[in-house]
């Protein structure tokens, strides 16, 4: 009987050992799988960190490039106007040099008037800069500054009778009001 018991115990122990071994193998397999998963996740984290740093550097480079482009835009925004101004200066220089040679002030006045008309024409067409403030215009306080007022009999509305300084508007915005003398009715 003892033999039978020992045999049964041995079988039980063997079965138990087999169960333990299987359980251990499962645990080992789970550990190996977990280690693989951890390694995969660590690699993925590393890749994502690398991608994040690259995108951050890319964005910083983009921001710097945009800032440089903005600075250049501001720096050279008036380049077209400056080219036109240089042409006007050339014409003025020619008029001055011509007047030194001939002393004909009527021709000098004509030349300077032509240059003024050229400047106003180009600025009007290209840049929408307009001059205003002429004798005979109705006085408009939003566009004209009355430096002096003269009372006369025959005026229905206040009217400009003398212009001290022309006014200018750019795209319908007043840059400078015209400084004028205004005539108005005594009544």
Curated annotation (Swiss-Prot):
**Annotated keywords:** Chaperone, Cytoplasm, Stress response
Membrane-crossing ranges are none
- Keyword Cytoplasm (UniProt): yes
- Is Cytoplasm tagged as a keyword? yes
Q: Which GO terms describe its molecular function?
A: adenyl-nucleotide exchange factor activity; protein homodimerization activity; protein-folding chaperone binding; unfolded protein binding
Segments for region (Disordered)? 1-30
Describe the subunit structure: Homodimer.
Similarity remark? Belongs to the GrpE family.
- What name has this protein been given in UniProt? Protein GrpE
Query: From which organism does this entry originate?
Result: Borreliella afzelii (strain PKo) (Borrelia afzelii)
Ranked from the top, the taxonomy reads: Bacteria, Pseudomonadati, Spirochaetota, Spirochaetia, Spirochaetales
């Amino acid at each position: 009987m003892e033999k039978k018991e020992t045999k049964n115990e041995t079988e039980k122990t063997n079965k138990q050992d087999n169960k333990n071994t299987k359980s251990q193998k499962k645990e080992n397999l789970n550990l190996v799988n977990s280690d693989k998963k951890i390694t995969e996740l660590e690699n993925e984290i590393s890749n994502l960190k690398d991608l994040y740093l690259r995108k951050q550097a890319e964005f910083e480079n983009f921001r710097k490039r945009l800032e440089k482009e903005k600075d250049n835009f501001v720096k050279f925004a008036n380049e077209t106007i400056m080219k036109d101004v240089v042409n006007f200066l050339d014409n003025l220089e020619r008029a001055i040099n011509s007047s030194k040679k001939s002393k004909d002030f009527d021709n000098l006045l004509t030349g300077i008037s032509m240059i003024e008309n050229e400047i106003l024409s180009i600025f009007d067409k290209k840049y929408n800069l307009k001059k205003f403030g002429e004798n005979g215009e109705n006085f408009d306080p939003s566009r004209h500054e009355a430096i002096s007022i003269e009372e006369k009999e025959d005026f229905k509305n206040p009217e400009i009778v003398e212009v001290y300084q022309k006014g200018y508007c750019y795209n319908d915005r007043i840059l400078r009001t015209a400084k004028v003398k205004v005539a108005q009715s005594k009544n």
